[in-house]
Amino acid sequence: MTTCERRVGDKLGTDDSAFARSSFDGEVYPDLPVVGPGMAHDIDERIRRRVQAAGTDRAAAASSSAPATTTVVVRTVAAQCLDAERVISKIRTSGNLFRCLDPNPHPTVRGALLCVSGGDAARASKEPTSGPANGLKDSRFILGQAYEMRERGEIPGSVDLWAVANPMTDSVDSFRWKVDAGARCFLTQPPFFRERSRSWFETVAATDQARDVDILVGVPMITSLRNLEFWLDLCGVSQDDREARRLKSTLPNVAQETDRAAYIEWNAKFIRETAWTMAGVTGMHVMPVTASGLQMTEEVMRDAPH
């Protein structure tokens, strides 16, 4: 399975053509702190229309001899700094976007919730002392609540629960906890630090829990040195780490900074020689992020392994 992170906020919908041409199996709508209530409503309405149209798709598929294709639509639910009541409300709202798909044994669209802690600045300032004492809710809380709500019928039983993992910083115990809490698919951060990430993937693949889940390795579309540095910061790793310096040295040189072809090849090589070589990987999660990255996506993915 290959999924793609969709653009949201005032960029919502601007990636429709690129998404359609690249033949992704799933689309992930992030829950970002910069996306206010109005923009979040726009995302929800878009998803609602998408899944409601699935009924028409199924009717057409039923009359066709061609096998029906299934797309996974994933709505992210981030705890950020919300209290338990508001987090539960988000789970309920997001989960019920997929109500019209339930029950359906052969949907052309499946729904999933990606359960994450969130990364806004206010949360980051509290996380050094995170836990029950300061009341911050995390991805395990969301997974646990969503699982129970699904069991009680408060959200559709067909909704899958997804989680995230960072192979450069997370413990294997974190993976186990999330699987035990109900996660059945993981999206990882890019394995920029190859050996550190390889160790995490190999250890995870050897666990009993890995038998029950899909692991989609994160693939960015790097467009410049500055863009790579943004990603390293996002992944919570030091710019001065030996692995970070090694990775930066592999980028196209300054003379090629605006050479699109050189960056297309860099990204394709990262997929072939790093991301897709990790143990236990069952697919990829592509994250274009920028307009330039989006433009590269179709060409990079054309020859990428699936």
Predicted regions and their residues:
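Catalytic cores of alpha/beta
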Residues: 83-97, 170-177, 225-231, 292-299
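Catalytic beta/alpha-barrel core
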Residues: 5, 26-38, 75-78, 113-117, ...
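Non-catalytic positions within long, well-ordered alpha-helices that form the structural scaffold/packing
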Residues: 20, 92-108, 179-180, 277
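Aromatic-anchored, glycine/proline-accented short structural segments
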Residues: 173-229
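Catalytic domains of carbohydrate-active enzymes, especially glycoside hydrolases
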Residues: 15-33, 178-181
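Active-site-adjacent beta->alpha loops and helix N-cap segments on the catalytic face
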Residues: 35-50, 81-87, 120-148, 170-172, ...
